[in-house]
Structure formats: structure tokens, C-alpha cells
Amino acid sequence: YFYSGFMFFYNLGRNHKMPGSAQEIRYINRDENTHLWLFRNMILELKNEEPELFTPDRVDVYREMIKEGCRQEIAWGHYAIGDKVPGLTKDMITDYIQYLGNLRCMSLGFEPIYEGHEKEPESMAWVSQYSNANMIKTDFFEARSTAYAKSSALVDDL
């Protein structure tokens, strides 16, 4: 249930409303993208180590799981946002979530689950400008670091 929520705040941000909230959502989105990258890599490694888990029948089950997740995300977006928020429509929500479902499938080496949604919808290209932490440029002297700070670990010799 992330992207329907993210796009609501990003829509506010692109309309110059609540920019601080949009920035906070970007931090959350960045963290979720880190989790996405981690689990994608774990699944790809599992594909190499345990290929019997990725037979055509099992891949069909996995694709159906992704499709069900998309269905629930779309239903939530329609309920929470619907056609009541200026700048967002149910069709935009559906198109974008179906695109993300295809993106997730293809990144795992699976066939897309939604025909015609292999590319980011033009009506939603602005979401990428907010969701990709590397795409928004700021004035170097006015910007705060958004990177995680490295800490030195104490070594316990017990």
C-alpha cells in the first residue's frame, strides 16, 4: 500500500503544497526502494541456488501473488484517493500500479502480468521525479544531507 500513498503526497508536492511532507515521503520511499533492491537480489540469488523453486508452474504462482498485491494496492488507491483529489484519477492509479507490477516481474526475469503497461505511463512520469532520490536537484549550499551517516561499531570482545 505504498505507492498509492506516496503519489498522493507527491501530487501535493508537484503543486507546491506541503513540500516538507513530500520530502518526508521521499525518505520513506528511498527506504522502501532499498528493501526492494535487497529482496530482489535475494530472490535472484535463490533462483541461481535453487532453480527447482522457479519452474514454470511456480513462477505462475509468484506472478499471481504479485498480481494480487497490485489488485489490493489499486483497490486501496481507489478507496483512499479515488477521483476526489485534483491531479489524480483512478485510471492514473491503476495504470501506475500495473506498470509497477510489470516492473517488479521483469526485474525478477518473469513475464509481465499486465499487457500494455510495460512502460511508465506518461501521465505519471512526475512520480519518478519524486520517488527517485537521485533525480531532484537542490542548491548545494541550502540542501541538507539525506544520506545515512556511517557509524563506527564498537567491538565487544566478550
Question: Would you name each region that the model predicts?
Answer:
Residues 1-158:
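Non-heme di-metal
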